[in-house]
Amino acid sequence: MSWQAYVDDHLMCDIEGHEGHRLTAAAIVGQDGSVWAQSATFPQFKPEEMNGIMTDFNEPGHLAPTGLHLGGTKYMVIQGEAGAVIRGKKGSGGITIKKTGQALVLGIYEEPVTPGQCNMVVERLGDYLLEQGL
């Protein structure tokens, strides 16, 4: 399966039991910041934004004082899982980032999608990739 198919079929799909509800944008990005696949709606990001995210995975709490920035949007960092998941909130939407062995799985959402639904979609694919050694 291509990386784009993972984004299209596993991240940008309808949320289970909620037809028509889906993430706003999603991507799979290598830990070096290279885009493996992304939705057409995924924001253009700066290398330093991805560097900040990677630093937070290695040094949990790094982004808390400044917020998580992606594509020029600032998210307030909320509870995640140190070294494994970063979660951010902005208004009625937010972001979930799951770290795998080689990549980051990113999902961005707005209402009516809930934070829990975004977490489920992103983390499920991330866990699958981890199981595959990716």
UniProtKB/Swiss-Prot annotation:
<dbReference type="Pfam" id="PF00235">
    <property type="entry name" value="Profilin"/>
</dbReference>
<keyword id="KW-0020">Allergen</keyword>
<keyword id="KW-0009">Actin-binding</keyword>
<dbReference type="GO" id="GO:0005856">
    <property type="term" value="C:cytoskeleton"/>
</dbReference>
<keyword id="KW-0963">Cytoplasm</keyword>
<dbReference type="InterPro" id="IPR048278">
    <property type="entry name" value="PFN"/>
</dbReference>
<protein>
    <recommendedName>
        <fullName>Profilin-2</fullName>
    </recommendedName>
</protein>
<comment type="function">
    <text>Binds to actin and affects the structure of the cytoskeleton. At high concentrations, profilin prevents the polymerization of actin, whereas it enhances it at low concentrations.</text>
</comment>
<keyword id="KW-0597">Phosphoprotein</keyword>
<dbReference type="InterPro" id="IPR036140">
    <property type="entry name" value="PFN_sf"/>
</dbReference>
<feature type="modified residue" description="Phosphothreonine">
    <location>
        <position position="114"/>
    </location>
</feature>
<dbReference type="GO" id="GO:0005938">
    <property type="term" value="C:cell cortex"/>
</dbReference>
<comment type="subunit">
    <text>Occurs in many kinds of cells as a complex with monomeric actin in a 1:1 ratio.</text>
</comment>
<feature type="short sequence motif" description="Involved in PIP2 interaction">
    <location>
        <begin position="84"/>
        <end position="100"/>
    </location>
</feature>
<feature type="disulfide bond">
    <location>
        <begin position="13"/>
        <end position="118"/>
    </location>
</feature>
<keyword id="KW-1015">Disulfide bond</keyword>
<keyword id="KW-0206">Cytoskeleton</keyword>
<dbReference type="InterPro" id="IPR005455">
    <property type="entry name" value="PFN_euk"/>
</dbReference>
<dbReference type="GO" id="GO:0003785">
    <property type="term" value="F:actin monomer binding"/>
</dbReference>
<dbReference type="InterPro" id="IPR027310">
    <property type="entry name" value="Profilin_CS"/>
</dbReference>
<comment type="similarity">
    <text>Belongs to the profilin family.</text>
</comment>
